[in-house]
Amino acid sequence: MKYDCIVVGGGHAGCEACLATARMGMKTLLVTGNIHNIADMPCNPSIGGSAKGIVVREIDALGGEMGKNADKTQIQMKMLNNKKGPAVQALRAQADNISYPKQMQETLFKQENLTVLEGMVEDLIVDEKTVKGIVLENGEKIYGQCVILTTGTYLKADILVGDTRHREGPHGEKPSQHLSDCLKNLGFQIIRLKTGTPQRVDKNSIRYEETKREDGDMTPYTFSFDDTPEYDVTKQTPCYLTYTTAETHQIIRDNLSKSSMYGGLDDIKGVGPRYCPSIEDKIVRFADKERHQLFLEPTSLESNEIYIQGFSTSMPHDIQEQMVHSIPGLEDAKILKYAYAIEYDSIYPTQIKQTLETKLIKNLYTAGQINGTSGYEEAACQGLMAGINAALKIQGKEPLILKRSDGYIGVLIDDLVTKGVRDPYRLLTSRAEYRLLLRHDNADLRLREYGYQVGLISDAQHDILLQKKNAIKEVLDQLQSYKITPVKEVRDYLETIPTAPLKDGITLYDLLKRPEIKISHIKHFIDFPYDSSILEQVEIHIKYEGYIMKAQREAEKMERLEAKKIPEDIDYNQIKNIASEARQKLQEVRPTSIGQALRISGVNPADISILMVYLKKGEKH
């Protein structure tokens, strides 16, 4: 059998990768260990969150599936940071972890050009540093022009609880034992990482009166820019807030040596996630904190399971019982699933290009947790980009590489391939230097054109984008040309807001720059036939104009450095006077531009100056 693209692993990265290649006309095969676990949510039952919610919007803008799937299956939706500025606002959905995978599986099974096969991949067929296909557990060989590895946490996975170690993946699934060895034998540097998941308790055993109810927003938000089903905001499922206690902390301190991470097992090499620490880590690292917040999150409308967010641990089961029962509201809680840590192999991500193709093996792409990231959203966006670039390569077209000023997806990939990882990488708004440009509300304006160019956005969707851009321009033009003067009617209205009285005439554009003036106030003077998404863009553009222009100038300055390309075959050993650490890092990362070289830790401006002089000399010759 021969395919254009073979995707290995049916998690969130694999789903986006195989859908992208199939929709771009590639004959695609998805191979996964268990077809019933496609798009599974083995950890938190949510999609989105700070920075991550913006990524889901970016995936949708490019033509990916995660946002649409989350909209169809969410049971609660919230806009985070809505009292802060637009740069940090992001959607978070409480996702139904039974219907989310089912819905995604339906989408995959109906997709043209896509075949789904249940099986384990044992080996890669490689000839002259180029991947040619895969070898299944039963010895069957399947050939393909490109292979995309989206193996998640399954490479040599071990489940850790107390002093026990079981060789298995999430939900007791069979791990991939030989693929990791195959990659090592091909010359890849393999690293060991770790993550964890908390307990699930029975919703009928919780004393809710001891917790604080957290409802969804009363605005019907959606991730997708396209038509998705409307939902009744009054029927959202609540979450509940509770806290650890002094008793919880004492139980953990008294039993710390029984935790896999703190003495239960002495052969752990995996490094855990810095921004999602276990409860043991929190108690040790933040010893001065009297309590830590925990969210009780429903996992599905079809299940009694409640996920205790913020309480992941690798303690033995009997200690977990004590810990859970020390929490207000959970005194009588029945544990349905115990918490555990999981250790797994990844490849060090400086070994991949910005296209997500590996540097060592041509036509081999990697996406998701195999690249050292954590989170469904981080995985999905990599899967989408790997799929797009694999298809573009087969089509003989230029790759799609998103800049740091294009989107959080660009930030994530650039961070991975330029800086590498020490622990599972999580996206944060603080990682983006142009975050005012990379907002939740403008992901379609930033990225939909790219999706259209590669063939994942239809003509109809593209027309809607053009209409939106024209409408925004039209409203901005109207506001700049419409002037009001301090006549009595205007003075009286402005007093009701209240805002400072006018001394002279002013355009509505300049009036809207006042902090207390909203677009709704402007409607008193001029009526717009446009929906709220258009007017929101206009308001943000005007109120943050100075900051946005400054960010754009900085991005353009960086783009000029990105345009200064570094030859692929450059030998850094030939460049005199570069510091030895910088030489080593440049040789390892092999940046494609001066802009990227500047972002490598250990490479300082003096090294960059020497490199630029060397490149100029080369141009002359």
Give the location of each predicted region.
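Beta1/beta-strand and adjacent pyrophosphate-binding region of the FAD-binding site
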Residues: 1-13
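Core beta-strand elements of the Rossmann-like FAD/NAD(P) dinucleotide-binding domain
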Residues: 3, 137-146
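Conserved N-terminal/central alpha/beta ligand/cofactor-binding core
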Residues: 19-123, 150-167, 174, 178-180, ...
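Internal hydrophobic alpha-helix adjacent to the cofactor/substrate pocket in enzyme cavities
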Residues: 23, 379-402
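An anion/pyrophosphate-binding glycine-rich loop and adjacent beta-alpha core
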Residues: 34, 52, 79, 180-321, ...
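Conserved beta-strand-loop-beta-strand element in the redox core of flavoprotein oxidoreductases
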Residues: 125-141
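A glycine-rich dinucleotide-binding beta-alpha-beta segment and adjacent secondary-structure elements
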Residues: 307-373, 401-414, 532-585, 590
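Extended, charge-enriched "interface" segments that sit outside catalytic cores
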Residues: 431, 448-607, 613-621
